[in-house]
Amino acid sequence: MILDTDYITEDGRPVIRVFKKENGEFKIEYDRDFEPYIYALLKDDSAIEDVKKITASRHGTTVRVVRAGKVKKKFLGRPIEVWKLYFTHPQDVPAIRDKIREHPAVVDIYEYDIPFAKRYLIDKGLIPMEGDEELKMLAFDIETLYHEGEEFAEGPILMISYADEEGARVITWKKIDLPYVDVVSTEKEMIKRFLKVVKEKDPDVLITYNGDNFDFAYLKKRSEKLGVKFILGRDGSEPKIQRMGDRFAVEVKGRIHFDLYPVIRHTINLPTYTLEAVYEAIFGQPKEKVYAEEIAQAWETGEGLERVARYSMEDAKVTYELGREFFPMEAQLSRLVGQSFWDVSRSSTGNLVEWYLLRKAYERNELAPNKPSGRELERRRGGYAGGYVKEPERGLWENIAYLDFRCHPADTKVIVKGKGVVNISEVREGDYVLGIDGWQKVQRVWEYDYEGELVNINGLKCTPNHKLPVVRRTERQTAIRDSLAKSFLTKKVKGKLITTPLFEKIGKIEREDVPEEEILKGELAGIILAEGTLLRKDVEYFDSSRGKKRVSHQYRVEITVGAQEEDFQRRIVYIFERLFGVTPSVYRKKNTNAITFKVAKKEVYLRVREIMDGIENLHAPSVLRGFFEGDGSVNKVRKTVVVNQGTNNEWKIEVVSKLLNKLGIPHRRYTYDYTEREKTMTTHILEIAGRDGLILFQTIVGFISTEKNMALEEAIRNREVNRLENNAFYTLADFTAKTEYYKGKVYDLTLEGTPYYFANGILTHNSLYPSIIISHNVSPDTLNREGCGEYDEAPQVGHRFCKDFPGFIPSLLGDLLDERQKVKKHMKATVDPIEKKLLDYRQRAIKILANSFYGYYGYAKARWYCKECAESVTAWGRQYIETTMREIEEKFGFKVLYADSVTGDTEVTIRRNGRIEFVPIEKLFERVDHRVGEKEYCVLGGVEALTLDNRGRLVWKKVPYVMRHKTDKRIYRVWFTNSWYLDVTEDHSLIGYLNTSKVKPGKPLKERLVEVKPEELGGKVKSLITPNRPIARTIKANPIAVKLWELIGLLVGDGNWGGQSNWAKYYVGLSCGLDKAEIERKVLNPLREASVISNYYDKSKKGDVSILSKWLAGFMVKYFKDENGNKAIPSFMFNLPREYIEAFLRGLFSADGTVSLRRGIPEIRLTSVNRELSDAVRKLLWLVGVSNSLFTETKPNRYLEKESGTHSIHVRIKNKHRFADRIGFLIDRKSTKLSENLGGHTNKKRAYKYDFDLVYPRKIEEITYDGYVYDIEVEGTHRFFANGILVHNTDGFFATIPGADAETVKKKAREFLNYINPKLPGLLELEYEGFYRRGFFVTKKKYAVIDEEGKITTRGLEIVRRDWSEVAKETQARVLEAILRHGDVEEAVRIVKEVTEKLSKYEVPPEKLVIHEQITRELKDYKATGPHVAIAKRLAARGIKVRPGTVISYIVLKGSGRIGDRTIPFDEFDPTKHRYDAEYYIENQVLPAVERILKAFGYKKEDLRYQKTRQVGLGAWLKMGKK
């Protein structure tokens, strides 16, 4: 594995160094033969001798071209000949390049600014980070002494902390008595100790957080001052600090310095990027912050040093955890881009694309364009036209799937599995069609109306822009390229088409209506041939009733298969039941992995014998399917299907070979001889190899089991198409092409996997979801290319792009997208969790790179910068959005008023491919499949969300997609306890429950389920919904397994395991205390008797026991501890049966749970200091239907009279009766107490008859947030559980038909949905969400509507923050009522004038004028002094403590001067002494609250306020009528 490269100089010549890790060892390789070079384009080749004579000086050395050679290259796709100029040393190039460029014969020079070591990686085709080496990582952090005003590194380093897989430690030079702290004598000794640690541990990766700009520079400067050689490099060098733009970057030779800070800044959006904020954002866990002044105070006073040391240790530990989280992604990007991890982790997305393009340009012999000069850079920064703007909407639209017609007419023939040859118009989504990889699933069928020219190629008709793969052979290679159909009409297409001669044959086989009986007979014959035995036995016995001997004729059919072959076993049972009406008996021998099916009936035996005698005349595919399922396998190494038979079974191979020949499936036979007990034995082998043979086997025969069929698919995918002639499946064909006119429907398919399928026997390209760049071939080398047969012209801007050949960048982007699909398919198929995770990182890296391409065109510093390309992509995006909006308006008479969505982000409960997960919603968003405006969509497969139906039942509903976008809306945090909250956007709806007598008994539940915005909570809706019904599957539990899970629960609560001692290999420890005898009787003894544990022994007199069980010791270490050694609950437990989860919880609560009465109310809780563990327990409780909550003690725990640094976290049981019924306690004393406490209490909540419980918001606050917000589409209910709370999801737009009645609008809306949805890409669909009888729209994010039931919904107009007075809120609410409920705008204006008049006359009660604002930071940190801050400072001066979080309530008084000087606390307001400032409240409170509403109707501010002269403003004359 290559870690990095650089070069050194020996005897004036460069020597490349390659830093590598091989077989666990670090090494440096040297290359002394690589020469620096540049390219020069000359006007006249004869001038090369003059160029070679040019000289320059570098450090007293004369620099010149040492040799030159003419080479053929391409520049923007056009052939060009340039001179390759070689030099002695890389530094010669910058010394001489300008002189060469200025020579009159030189047109330009190229690739003169590619760093030498990077050039080496490109030219040699070397890929950093490639390989499976396990890299050692070490993170470190420093704490320093700093006082305000000091110079950088003036203060000493106080602590150096480091962390790796063995844990975290702190080195310091003051006495601190903590187990993880190493104390030395001085700062100098501390630095030397750290350097020794790095040398001894010898990490491959050093992880820091902002180490580029702080830690390394500080350490180096202090080392210089203290006389310490700061050597960290594996070559004995000190870290190299270099400038990179406006930042620094630090290299450590031979080690990767991974600075997390630039990576995280590029990866996630956060309001602040402190280590604490990042850790909480990534892992959801808070981390304490100790500020510089606190560190200084602790160091100088000696008080609180333990806290600083803990903080320092946690800094290193957190940095290490973050490093482990982000390293794999950056490693994959490094591999993908082909540059070092160090470079890639510090690169912008534009630079990532650039380095990728440079490598691909070299591979394709393309000459890279130059970077812009300073003047050119300024010109480029002039910008280009933005995205489509529909007033009031604004947005930049990129990579929108354009509905390009690349299709076939309706009568084009394809082969569908189980149907045979059918018209393409008859194909349905979910069908399997014959493709290049055999059977391939149809994801989407595309249908369009078309009128125009079709190209007929060998009988296959397609639209001119459709693509067909063409094989072109040269002496060196066989290349497959996609060519446009229209290109076949010219002489530009060289090569042959790929066809299959078996098109009709496979179609006929699939179309054959073979009776099921014949199929089952064939499969049974194949199974018996492979795995069966027909037994006939005569047994002599004495018949006592007749007094003579008799003979019993016994007949038996036996089939033996593997115990794990469940699909095979089910098929065998089905065959016997259908053919013979009997169910086989099943036997399993002890200590074997085999199951034998037996049928002992003469009539069955005779019929099976008859079937076997005619095996060669049975349905051949069925016979082979049965045989290969029994005796065949897929060799994953050789990628073949193979059968082995012993010495005496050659005849079986003969039978199978004849049947394969009958079907035309190529195969080979060979033998393998070996010696066993001095006797020569022979294995007969039959193997189906080659892609053609495998595909024929798959399409005609296949396996019975899903597992083997998937293995076969994988083998086919991994088989190269390396022989396209003279094989059984593919043939190459010459072509003829002509055109014809066509009017009608055209179709295309989107397939899973490789994008090709057979149509009319010819391989054709399938439709993808192309980006604009790919579909329109947008590239600098295709821009306005002369001499092309066909162009795509960008709308509005008029730039034309040649479609005759794939552009450089579109082809690379297409390759990336194809590669990502392959990786994702492989990821889906693999069962290895490590491989799956690596593949996930790979596909995400590809996504990051691919999504960067559009921005690259507009990146002013880019080599392949193309303003015209960027403008064109944007223009096509504008056209797509305009077309969509225009179609709803023109074809259906709608007027689009506003289109937007509401979203939320948090953890959701899903079921993915049948497995339950609790996953952050952003993790569901793996890629951008589609963009519509500023929204991005990721299409999901196999994902369901837990939701609630209208009958109050928990159900799983399909999630077609997840959506995200940026937002400037306010984000509210709704707190349910001090540790349980939900973050939602201001207009996101939660599902509230009306637990009120206003809803009549017996009414449907849906009348109680209401949508409520965050700011509406606490009004009529006071309770929200949380799950309260089991969703885990149930089984008939094994009693011993129940006991085992009870023991594991006890261990997680009160056990200990793991470590390096010999004891830890064989034992786990359990503290039983006074309950030891009961635990022995109920758990340990039954497990010992069942041999689950070997034994247990007393460890102490306090009830501690050691449990002997090597497997259990290993199991607990592997699954129930995290990487930091803390107790953990593995995610696989979320998919255990309900009975085992309950057993685990029973053991856990018996160990760490308590039961008590608090204020007469029963209380059950589990207490821990481990937040991750507590969160997992909550999820397990939800799975078994026990509602719960979580809260954290605010006071830290104490141990030996000292604060321990931990806080108790309590999981509280809400549904106590279900807990008692299903979980309870193992310990009698706790069970008795629980029973006593619950004796007089019942579950009184009305909601308990449904599948949910109620939870009550305690506090709502606005938070700062700058990231993406997310939403998921849930089919049917539009609800899902987020952080255990039921919320609503929506994603829609508003439209109306002016003048139409309600029913017409509703009808036309549904017609539009039926029209537009087939045109939308993927699973993206519009739905009819509701009808609003009136509404108005101010801007794209400000509107108000009222529905048919009179409910008003607003967005962007609400004034719910504390800094709005009641008079402003009340006035706005009345204005909205007047406009929406009564449709009277003039009434709304009268209301505003009335309020402003009352304010002017001091008739408004002072309590309606109070403004509330919160102090959010320390007072000394405020630079601007607002009114609330001014009051706070005055209060503080009077000795009143004002802390962050304090709410200041004030009134603004009449007077002159600054507002802050005229505010007083409300409780000091005296109406007899004070007068409020009426003008302030009119101008700054009331009018701003209503002005943004009424300006939509033509009113201005001066039209709205009370005026004694009653003058009417011009705006009033221009106002719109009633709406």
Swiss-Prot record:
Identification of the protein by name: DNA polymerase
Reactions this protein catalyses: DNA(n) + a 2'-deoxyribonucleoside 5'-triphosphate = DNA(n+1) + diphosphate
Organism this protein belongs to: Thermococcus fumicolans
Gene Ontology MF terms in the entry: DNA binding; DNA-directed DNA polymerase activity; endonuclease activity; nucleotide binding
Keywords assigned by UniProt, alphabetized: Autocatalytic cleavage, DNA replication, DNA-binding, DNA-directed DNA polymerase, Endonuclease, Hydrolase, Intron homing, Magnesium, Manganese, Nuclease, Nucleotidyltransferase, Protein splicing, Repeat, Transferase
Record's keyword annotation contains Nuclease: yes
Function summary: Spliced protein is a DNA polymerase used in PCR reactions. Yields 5'-phosphate and 3'-OH ends. It only cleaves linear DNA with Mn(2+) and requires a 19-bp minimal recognition sequence.
Cofactor: Mg(2+); Mn(2+)
Chain ranges passing through the membrane: none
Thermal activity profile: Optimum temperature is 70 degrees Celsius.
CC cofactor note: For PI-TfuII intein endonuclease.
EC number(s) on file: 2.7.7.7, 3.1.11.-
Start and end residues of each DOD-type homing endonuclease domain: 524-665, 1047-1186
PANTHER family according to UniProt: DNA POLYMERASE CATALYTIC SUBUNIT, DNA POLYMERASE DELTA CATALYTIC SUBUNIT
